[in-house]
Amino acid sequence: MIKKRLFIGSSSEELKTAEIVKEVLLKDFEVTIWNDNVWDTAVFKINQNFLADLLKASLQFDFGILIGTKDDKVMFREVEMIQPRDNVLFELGLFTGRLGTSKCAFLIDKEIKLPSDFNGLTLARFDSTNEATVIAGANSIKDLFLASADDEINFFPSATLASVYYENLIVPICRFIIDNNGFTKGDTHYQKCKLNIIVPERINQDVNLQFEKLKGLFTTENVSFKYSGRPRQISVDTQIKNDTLEFIDFPTIITGINHAISNLLPNDFNKQSPDYSSILDRELRRFITTLKKLLIRGGFDEMVNVKRDSEL
């Protein structure tokens, strides 16, 4: 089973704390620590290349933990206060916006006072003089992340496309079968029906051509039917196997994943790089995961199989 990827952001002065947190999480997650060394070499603490890396990272990780420590002194209403580094707060905002509040957490020193804007975020406090409190905070965040990993649908491009595909094709087919106690094809009524959704292992540049090659592995016949409330006919390929009518669909909607990711990344990002391929692969897995969650929620999971082309 592929481990979920987790990002830890901290100041370079608190790498020891980040390493403790990483040790707690390594059993359940693939963990990467990002510290602020790169910020120290950037113009005004920020540049386009670094932002590109952060945007890329926010698409490559499933969860984020930002560690807030007593790094900077600031004056607030004529009172001296201690706050985390600006870059840590920036990363917290970026990852929370991208991943959602249930998949991003702030592990923060107990002596830091946070503004009310942080209400609603997942917070865990620790005492910088007591390692046990760091471990306890990391464990509480770990439990939250593990609990949220399989029961939420986020709105990454892949999840949005999966939701559209589910509502516009899967639901009409399944409801039509249920309402009609099967499906009539020609002179034969089939009570046993199944929908097979075939998803490729990777997304090629021309997804339509990719699916046409996959369709060559099947001997199918196209059927169409009118679904209540829809202005158009639903059209889908079918085959008969073991007295079961199998609907077969190749979701060309996944073409949108490539376009969406391209728009989310900087224009000069290398679309041929391993990092880009990694992001696409992750989104394809999210597409499948989201579909399976929606099928369970809708009660259609026993009627639908989602397969990778390698399983054919």
UniProtKB/Swiss-Prot annotation:
GO biological process: defense response to virus
Top-rank taxon, per record: Bacteria
Gene Ontology molecular function, alphabetical: NAD+ nucleosidase activity; NADP+ nucleosidase activity; nucleotide binding
Coiled-coil residues: none
EC supergroup of this enzyme: hydrolase
Activity-regulation annotation: NAD(+) hydrolase activity is strongly stimulated by c-di-GMP, weakly by 3'3'-cGAMP, very weakly by c-di-AMP but not at all by 2'3'-cGAMP. Self-association of TIR domains is required for NADase activity.
Catalytic reaction annotation: NAD(+) + H2O = ADP-D-ribose + nicotinamide + H(+)
UniProt-listed CDD domains: STING_bact-like
Similarity comment: In the C-terminal section; belongs to the bacterial STING family.
Function, as annotated: Effector protein of a CBASS antiviral system with NAD(+) hydrolase activity. CBASS (cyclic oligonucleotide-based antiphage signaling system) provides immunity against bacteriophage. The CD-NTase protein synthesizes cyclic nucleotides in response to infection; these serve as specific second messenger signals. The signals activate a diverse range of effectors, leading to bacterial cell death and thus abortive phage infection. A type I-D CBASS(GG) system.
Domain text: The N-terminal TIR domain mediates NAD(+) hydrolase (NADase) activity. The cyclic nucleotide binds in the C-terminal bacterial STING region. Upon binding to c-di-GMP the STING region closes around the ligand, which is bound by residues from 2 adjacent subunits. STING-STING interactions are the main drivers of filamentation; rearrangements in the STING domain allow reorganization of packing of the TIR domains, forming the NADase active site; cross-filament contacts strengthen the assembly.
Quaternary structure, from the entry: Forms homodimers; in the presence of c-di-GMP forms filaments with an ordered array of parallel-stacked subunits.
Protein name: CD-NTase-associated protein 12
Gene: cap12
